[in-house]
């Protein structure tokens, strides 16, 4: 909780922060409370801090007073800052003077209210140690009293940079600096929202280091929308540019600084090269599906960054379909494929792939298993399919804790370079999580999967089950699949780019005929029946079918068959 703005207390001096370890980011206020501008931790005053505040004595320093330093009593004088390239006239205009107290020289910056009264000062010695006098509150801006509205105002981190910009503009145009530096830029700018809103443009000329760039992003978010410009300098800050002969570059930024654009928003005008590169990249060209050309006609394939949902009733051919696509993409197209088949062991997955590749149902034939081991074909088949290290499998049968699974999928993409990852199936991930709210769990998981696919450019194929209909025939008996039949959360259909449904009547007179229906395709907008495939019991493949009968004749067959082995 940030209470630093609500208190009438005044800032005393900087102290170390026990929470984040900053040596001087923490601030002690007159009522004893502290606030760290680095980690933003607010701590209420206790007896210890109240006692320190009452003494107002920073470590190694001299007792301070609530009163500002008097120009005459402090042997004050206005002087050019020759080492900084700043004239006496500029210092006098801004209220930046030299004091000599107890034989020690100080630079003093007067902070004034809009009536011109000095309310606080920032005092700096030759070793760059700072302290303040008076009521140095969170809205402190050096030079604020000089300007009231206009076309542009420049905001710098420190007083020296502010004086530099004033010098180059002959003290004619608005410029201020942050009273508490870059670490408090957001708080200072937020506290001065109405003041900054008087200007048409607000130019943030912060330091070019990491802290300065971070401060720009934080401050810009709390300033009037559409008015913020960001200066980019060739040196660390405005004064360093001035000392190195880059005055022209400073003024160029005053007049032509680019607008601040928040993360996530880009100008289309800036995308020419990115679009040119994308048009010729593999991500913009779809990976084609096998088994049914109509899928490609309606979807134009699967593109990088897309989530492809495959669904059907139980035992309808989902796993066979995705294994077939994996084999096609890995062998014919040379893509690297990751498979997380959570309902089977990696041995079973590999055996099915070997069988498909050689057009035999290897796992279902004990005699064939023995034969290829004895005659040496196993090694030949294995090397032909896996010798080029194209396929990578998730080796944790029935273990699908969400974060662990996502970490493994991320490794498949970033560490192994997989172009396609297949997840079979999403329901087992949800059931393994232990969450009581399945809908919420699917929402979170789909959001993470979508973000993963989009951010990495991988094609992510996910298998999803269907919910049981309330009445009427089951999906396993040829019931057409609707996009609302996906089991779980609406996120399944909302976050998927393409949804492919497989339909067949396991008990009909054509139990091996599979209707392919496109329920959604974000890329083309095309939906509907894509065609038919037929399961070949000899080869284990879903092959293109010339069947072109009406959908009703496919879905309403009433004969029964026991062949449900997919």
UniProtKB/Swiss-Prot annotation:
Residues 550-566 are annotated as: Binding to viral DNA polymerase. GO terms for molecular function: 5'-3' DNA helicase activity; ATP binding; ATP hydrolysis activity; DNA helicase activity; DNA-directed RNA polymerase activity; identical protein binding; single-stranded DNA binding; zinc ion binding. Mg(2+) 1 binds at residues 157, 207. A zinc finger (C4-like) spans 17-39. Its EC number is 2.7.7.-, 3.6.4.12. Residues 543-566 are annotated as: Disordered. HAMAP family: Helic_Prim_T7. This is DNA helicase/primase. It comes from Escherichia phage T7 (Bacteriophage T7).
